[in-house]
Amino acid sequence: MQFDYIIIGAGSAGNVLATRLTEDPNTSVLLLEAGGPDYRFDFRTQMPAALAFPLQGKRYNWAYETEPEPFMNNRRMECGRGKGLGGSSLINGMCYIRGNALDLDNWAQEPGLENWSYLDCLPYYRKAETRDVGENDYHGGDGPVSVTTSKPGVNPLFEAMIEAGVQAGYPRTDDLNGYQQEGFGPMDRTVTPQGRRASTARGYLDQAKSRPNLTIRTHAMTDHIIFDGKRAVGVEWLEGDSTIPTRATANKEVLLCAGAIASPQILQRSGVGNAELLAEFDIPLVHELPGVGENLQDHLEMYLQYECKEPVSLYPALQWWNQPKIGAEWLFGGTGVGASNHFEAGGFIRSREEFAWPNIQYHFLPVAINYNGSNAVKEHGFQCHVGSMRSPSRGHVRIKSRDPHQHPAILFNYMSHEQDWQEFRDAIRITREIMHQPALDQYRGREISPGTECQTDEQLDEFVRNHAETAFHPCGTCKMGYDEMSVVDGEGRVHGLEGLRVVDASIMPQIITGNLNATTIMIGEKIADMIRGQEALPRSTAGYFVANGMPVRAKK
């Protein structure tokens, strides 16, 4: 089998590339996905409110676990990643958050990455998006990804939580992806007007999968990339339960889009990475790149949970006897409780003036429950998910075997810097202050977690060690740049090799201030134009907020 391009991984970036490259009917593309289809009648992935379900099994989730995390009481921590058409956009929380403009401007300060500034990237965010209230300087109106805005009156807790943040002295913003990210406001979500999850399989592949020049193979586990000298010329993979490899050749390029955990793993198995690590598994060295699998970053978060004194939370939706009605409303009308992910309000703040842009993110949820659906509080409640955005902690992904089915060693080194501890202490204390504002007085009952007895630095630190969880945002393991630990250049091309790019969240040099899916899609759109040799979209002229040392909040 011969194709112009072989794409490994049908996730948030891979599906973008598959769709854009096959717009040219003379370009042939093979898209390999280790998981299965995105079954449209499976409510677990299609109903926004069911977002916890895919994380509980292994049909749609790689269900990785970390090595014992040394600063988290040696806990082995969850590291869920999407498996199936759509990748992690098939199982994520559907929050459409792009990050802060200064994240991208910060990337662009690295030599060679100048065209990754916010204003250079904004046209590609817009290209990918159809926002339900129409386009403007910041938002698109005819892109493949459906973005839904929060509507007033859905749940009084959303408005109350935003108002409480404002009463605590923080800004109000009407668009966390617009002129000003900093502040509290409604949260956009990747949900269709029909109340379905807007994964990249739905948004992109639906328009491309019938093209004769696109071949999609599911249940295709990539074993390794084939090289001729320093040039990538094809891919070998295992189909289903087969132990006999299948191979295809790429006339132009192999595009690795397997995500921050699997992309470095595939490079290492293919002979690209740290020479000592590869020698340990008798993998012939194709090219030494010590940065492959290093620079691993993530967002860590905690839940601060409160009893709700009024019966307005989602607690009744957790009762089995209410779920048939919720399911029917969603299935036949695309409406009701099932049609929202219920992350409809949130915010970004600076915990201290020393941060030039927000370093703390909030997601508000009108129920008290773990992200993966476990440990639901059996009463009316609500919670804040809160965590730091740009931790200095760095980890790694390293193969443990040549077997593609063997999970790699993953270590995030969460909370390995004093800055991490200070940010989380600040975050808990600020959150408590926000939760005790007048806007929440009629709803707020007792603090369920951490509990009012948890007050000192030592007590807060122990709570974080035992209870903080991943926000499922791994990135950075094939970082873009030109220093000795970089893996790809500013166009995603792997240093020292030909015919091979990495295009996914692994190339982010530094993690962004917010959820990763929107920016991963943008990366796919931007590099798709580079691959095709097309001129970049014209730079945006939109304005954006810069704090420039402003106080973090208004004085009361």
UniProtKB/Swiss-Prot annotation:
Any GO BP annotation: glycine betaine biosynthetic process from choline
Enzyme class: oxidoreductase
Pfam family name, one: GMC_oxred_C
Catalytic activity: choline + A = betaine aldehyde + AH2; betaine aldehyde + NAD(+) + H2O = glycine betaine + NADH + 2 H(+)
Any GO molecular function: flavin adenine dinucleotide binding
Keywords: FAD, Flavoprotein, NAD, Oxidoreductase
Entries under NCBIfam families matching the protein: betA (TIGR01810), PRK02106.1 (NF002550)
Keyword Endoplasmic reticulum: no
Source organism of the structure: Escherichia coli O139:H28 (strain E24377A / ETEC)
EC number: 1.1.99.1, 1.2.1.8
Gene3D superfamilies linked to this entry: FAD/NAD(P)-binding domain (3.50.50.60), Glucose Oxidase, domain 3 (3.30.560.10)
Active site: H473 (proton acceptor)
Cofactor: FAD
Pathway where this protein functions: Amine and polyamine biosynthesis; betaine biosynthesis via choline pathway; betaine aldehyde from choline (cytochrome c reductase route): step 1/1
Amino-acid positions noted as binding FAD in the UniProt annotation, renumbered to this chain: 4-33
SUPFAM superfamilies xref list: FAD-linked reductases, C-terminal domain, FAD/NAD(P)-binding domain
Name the record gives this protein: Oxygen-dependent choline dehydrogenase
Family from the record: Belongs to the GMC oxidoreductase family.
